[in-house]
Design a protein with these regions (language model features):
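Short beta-strand/loop motif that positions the catalytic acidic residue
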Residues: 193, 199-201
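Cap/lid segment of the alpha/beta-hydrolase catalytic domain
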Residues: 35-38, 64, 68-71, 88-108, ...
Length: 285
């Protein structure tokens, strides 16, 4: 199969302005390629979905980032039989950072992800092929925070107060890529997390260090299935799909990696690793 691609407008349940999302999904149509902004997707715009019922995966981008930066993961998973929805978080994206690094962003982000799942399931084209019994989440950096809150993590504010997020019981597995876990260091922050987790950290990540991630994961309940992989030589931004050549420069950190790290090669293996984990985690109970 190949990947189709559509753009959706997501309605926020709190009455705020709608926000955009990109959806990739399985199709049997040949790949024509689609350009969104400066980025190329190996996906056919508005292609007919393949017949069947496919797991739904929400991908949450990092703080101040973009929902267009995880193309390698989204395209691979869609072609492998997943419906992928990647929302742009209002107030915490590349064009609007008014809520970045705030408790408000921490409160809102899990709701945005849940509304994105709702939108796919309710869509007249995608809903019939989306399997509501197999839902998962992938998140990078602050998106990893989002995914962890979705599966029951209780975040705490910098001032020491619980942030009243809501878990989404539909989400049965989560992949956390260089996740922001300092929100979950208070006692029992992860006491209600029971779904399988795949956590992938960068050895040379100085933004969300493997040490802080390990400290937070130590709070998971005994028996929770968690795998922590530390990628040798990887930095914080190594989890972003390689940027087009004209965007790669030393003064644009998201396009750079620690010396010697092969981001292009990593993004051949990373989507496969994620797919293997999700296939097992979402297998029929």
């Amino acid at each position: 199969m190949n990947s189709g691609i559509r753009q959706l407008e997501i309605r926020d349940s709190e009455g705020a302005a709608p926000f955009p999302a990109v959806v990739q999904y399985p199709t049997t149509e040949s790949s024509a390629g689609t350009t969104l902004g400066p980025y190329h997707f190996d996906a056919t715009r508005d292609a007919a979905p393949a017949a069947g019922r496919f797991p739904v995966c929400v991908i949450s981008h990092g703080g101040g980032g973009s929902h267009l930066l995880y193309r390698s993961i989204g395209t691979h998973l869609a072609a492998s039989g997943y419906v992928i929805v990647s929302p742009e978080h209002p107030g915490d994206n590349r064009n609007d950072r008014s809520r970045s690094n705030t408790d408000r962003a921490a409160l809102d982000r899990p709701r945005h992800a849940a509304r994105a799942i709702d939108a796919v399931l309710a869509d007249p084209v995608l809903g019939p092929v989306a399997d509501a019994s197999r839902v998962c989440a992938v998140g990078h950096s602050m998106g990893g925070y989002t995914a962890l809150a979705l599966v029951g993590g209780q975040p705490w504010s910098r001032s020491g107060q619980p942030i009243p997020t809501r878990a989404d019981p539909r989400v049965r597995a989560a992949v956390l890529l260089a996740p922001s876990t300092d929100w979950f260091l208070a006692p029992r922050s992860l006491a209600d997390v029971s779904v399988p987790l795949l956590v992938i950290a960068g050895e040379r990540d100085h933004v969300t260090s493997p040490e802080t991630i390990r400290q937070a994961l130590a709070g998971l309940p005994t028996g929770t299935s968690v795998t922590l992989d530390v990628v040798p030589g990887a930095g914080h931004y190594s989890f972003l799909t390689p940027f087009p050549a004209h965007m790669r420069r030393p003064d644009f950190p998201p396009s750079t990696d620690p010396d010697g790290f092969d981001r292009a090669g990593f993004h051949v293996e990373l989507p496969r690793r994620i797919e293997a984990f999700l296939t097992q985690a979402l297998a029929p109970r």
